[in-house]
Amino acid sequence: MLSRMPGPGPIALVGSGEFLPVMAEVDAGLLASSGRSRPRVAILPTASWPDGETVFRRWAAMGAEHFSALGAEVEPVLVLDRLDADDEAHAQAIGEADLVYLSGGKPGHLTESLLGTRVGAAIVAAHERGAALVGCSAGAMILAARHFDFRMRRLLWPLRWQDSLDLIPAVTVIPHYDAWPEALSAMFVLQAPRHFVTLGIDEDTAAVGRDGSWQVQGAGRVTVWHGRRRERFRRGEVFRL
């Protein structure tokens, strides 16, 4: 379990499974790291907005139910797009949270909604003051330095890379890693920005890190690519970035 300590808070990169029982142990540990009896949680379902309002609101409701059951005070922050992300009230909600959760969907939409906005700045500031940040799938991708994006393209190659929030410098993330053929994942890795580390995070699995030390939690493995060199880590194992 991570304990409350000065400086930047923990970051959890989740391959899939947000708000499901399989992630309850991981999320409970992150809540405990706040040191509060009733931590405040902000849920950002922004990445799912392109999938429609029904999906967007379902993720918000699932997040509220999941974290309420873990003893948290939960506020879904209903940021649809970039305009909403410049709303001071939304930024304030992030600023008051002990844990900020970015759920899955479309990473390109999430990036374009948050970068250079009040909410984006509030997420970074929350991390720096000690709040836990959790990103699942698309959310995990944008907590890193850069991410790939497939949208509106007939050809996947070469990959198009976008800047992310850069809370984990020189790192890119492939979520749902065990759902991809690894030969395809290797092609992603080979096109990653020069000198970047790529983290492949299996479904129902998290890499939880602080101060450069990362532990694997959940059901699967984390695959760490340094260029063409690959290492795998299982539940409970630790690696450094």
Which ranges hold each PLM region?
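A general structural motif
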Residues: 8, 36-41, 97, 130
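Portal/gating segments that form or line small-molecule/metal binding sites
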Residues: 42, 48-105, 109
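General beta-strand structural signal in soluble alpha/beta enzymes
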Residues: 13, 75-76, 101-102, 133-136, ...
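Class I SAM-dependent methyltransferase SAM-binding "motif I" and its flanking Rossmann-like core
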Residues: 103, 111-179
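C-terminal and late-domain segments of enzyme folds
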Residues: 2-38, 47-61, 65-68, 147-241
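Short, flexible loop segments at the rims of nucleotide/cofactor-binding pockets, characterized by
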Residues: 17-21, 76-81, 109-113, 175-177
